[in-house]
């Protein structure tokens, strides 16, 4: 009640799980900011997982493009979000509620991974009345995505290389543990490796800030085939 006005919770029509795009700073995590997605999903129960590596798990490395792990993380968040709603809301979901998952960029890859999880775990799909996913512009196949980056030979989003490699080395030590970053990156990159590592590990820098730093310090070639915001 506020100024003699009584507010009532409105029963959500469905659960919408929103998978966020690529972030590198903890301040951008859904639990640490005010995501605009909450304003555009309508009369729904909106649940946005931070992913491992942000929020309460900031001290852990983020498994970037490890879709299977991020999907499991999201399913856990779905259950936790619903439990919180059930505890604090003065209403219930509408009787014919369903669940969908949406996302773009990294969130698109994770949204599709959640859909695959539901397809292969029908007991979860039944409990959550899973209806559909909307996955946009996502790296659905990380290895093919990286292959296409290399085919193009240049990028305006250079952080994707170290971010992906660091994640994969941490996620699959049995496969990639025999390699070191020193074997995979240029001398120019290795000269500022400590700075780059700090920018990722501190979780204090946005993707824009990290990309700017990489472009500024590693862009050693300028020619007519490169725009101002691209790097080989």
Residue map of PLM features:
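Surface-exposed acidic, glycine-flexible loop patches that form ligand/cofactor-binding
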Residues: 2-11, 36, 84-95, 122-127
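A conserved short beta-strand
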Residues: 124-140
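Glycine-rich nucleophile elbow surrounding the catalytic serine of serine-hydrolase chemistry
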Residues: 72, 103-116
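Short beta-to-alpha linker loops that shape the active-site pocket of alpha/beta-hydrolase fold enzymes
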Residues: 22, 50-54
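Accessory cap/linker subdomain of secreted extracellular hydrolases
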Residues: 136-231
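Alpha/beta-hydrolase fold nucleophile elbow
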Residues: 89-106, 129-131
């Amino acid at each position: 009640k506020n100024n003699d006005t009584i507010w009532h919770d409105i029963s959500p029509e469905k659960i919408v799980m929103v998978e966020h795009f690529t972030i590198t700073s903890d301040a951008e995590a859904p639990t640490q900011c005010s995501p605009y997605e909450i304003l555009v999903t309508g009369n729904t129960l909106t649940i946005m997982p931070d992913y491992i590596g942000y929020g309460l798990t900031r001290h852990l490395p983020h498994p970037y493009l490890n879709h299977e792990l991020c999907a499991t993380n999201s399913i856990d968040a779905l259950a936790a979000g619903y439990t919180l709603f059930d505890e604090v809301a003065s209403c219930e979901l509408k009787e014919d509620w369903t669940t969908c998952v949406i996302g773009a960029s990294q969130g698109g890859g994770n949204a599709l991974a959640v859909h695959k999880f539901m397809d292969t775990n029908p007991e979860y799909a039944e409990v959550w009345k899973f209806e559909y996913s909307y996955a946009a512009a996502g790296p659905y196949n990380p290895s093919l995505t990286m292959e296409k980056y290399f085919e193009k030979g240049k990028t305006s989003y250079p952080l994707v290389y170290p971010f992906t490699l660091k994640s994969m080395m941490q996620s699959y030590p049995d496969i990639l543990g025999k390699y070191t970053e020193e074997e995979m990156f240029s001398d120019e990159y290795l000269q500022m490796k400590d700075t780059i590592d700090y920018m990722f590990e501190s979780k204090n820098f946005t993707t824009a800030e990290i990309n700017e730093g990489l472009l500024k310090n590693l862009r050693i070639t300028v020619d007519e085939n490169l725009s101002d915001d691209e790097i080989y």
